[in-house]
């Protein structure tokens, strides 16, 4: 491992590959034409100033989730660390699924995580935001080249016949009756596909490789299909579209990507990736050396699902309030819950990159968040289950029931403030005759070891006075409605007499004089099962009925004045964030629980 700034960079197999390529000059002779292009375009360019090029290539057909966040941190982070650039590419080759709403949300998520797709080499600013659909002309040209070179053919079998003739792991495939067509026939038929003369599904263009290959992905995979659908970028210009496995390597090569990093499910596709780029380099359409694909294990996080289909089901069936529900593992959901970009980056670094699937405990993510917020989140007191505490001798000690005093406490503990850093101003809040305390901080008959309020016991109101409990009032059902105590004069925190009376405990409280009512949303895990959809289980059966509890709390004024998205540590309760959608709307004070002070996940 090496230390870079404050971040610990742990070596992994991808870093080792990149370092070896840099040491041996694998890509040192590359040219860069100033944007994506074919061999001739890059030949006319300059030596590539980027030592490596990676890419983050989502399909714009849904909201990004925590697994994508790992990939974003990996690809942008490697480019940053090795003097390269990471391309932001939308893999929008499927005309039926893409929506601009998703494009915008993805760009916003990447920037929120702390990354951008700009480069500035030698004073030349470039944006590397690309759309795969802008490469359709080249992809079509590449397909025609493969046909004329005898590497592709138009197949008019039914989908069912193609499936049967493909064979399986124990049985080789059977050649299509159309496989022996001449390149001239295939080219004419392919152009009829392009010109809309064939119905959807009537034919596909297939690569001509090996129907007996032990790798089923090399048994003449389909590379173009007929699909009449309006594309968000190209409109109705095309009625044929490339398959993802054909488009993806070409996109990488046009953009001069050096290290194409994918998840493990694409490992079996790598031989086709390499085969296709070798053919197109042979034909002079693309520049050698071509990109190489490397696979890593995707993120499996306990108590979380990341299937877009299943997440959409949660939204559509109103199991959650939307894609940004704070219980969702989407980046918009994590952001609204109160997770920080720094915590997610730390998490991605900490879990590392491996080639073997494993499960990461959710507590690891929460631990990274606590680590980030510990020194940043201002403290404040909030009472989540309030009961009134009446200081019965207040007027006797201070002259009137309406008298109040200011109390102060640090916004951040002194231990969290770095040397030379100016501490933030203290919080100021009022104490008076009536204050709010947690209901659990009073017991009429205390259990053994209980140190908080019970008749005759002495405790400190944190930042305020020492008090002695005298009793309580109850309603007809026997529920405590008020706790009664006497204030002990001369014991206020921060005054010379503060330690004159020893208190068994200090409890949090909020004054009735300036406390503000707040809606506090206590979020917990969305599922009760650590692997809710593993082994064919119905994930809906594992929904946690207690994943959201809403309480009316009382908070000190510094918390009520929070801006949306501002994070705090509610003393003793955990970390909370002012809700970015609802806080402040119509004067409402709304907080979400991000996580507790300790791990609650085991």
Residue ranges and their predicted role:
Residues 2-175, 238, 265-293, 298-303, ...:
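N-terminal Rossmann-like or analogous alpha/beta NTP/dinucleotide-binding catalytic cores
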Residues 53-62, 85-93, 253-261, 325-331, ...:
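Glycine- and acidic
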Residues 94, 100, 131, 145-311, ...:
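Active-site cores that bind ATP or allylic diphosphates and position pyrophosphate for catalysis
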Residues 134, 260-262, 332-336:
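Short, well-ordered beta-strand elements within core beta-sheets of diverse protein domains
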Residues 288-368, 372:
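Long, charged, mostly alpha-helical binding arms that flank functional sites
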Residues 348-602:
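Substrate/cofactor-recognition hotspot
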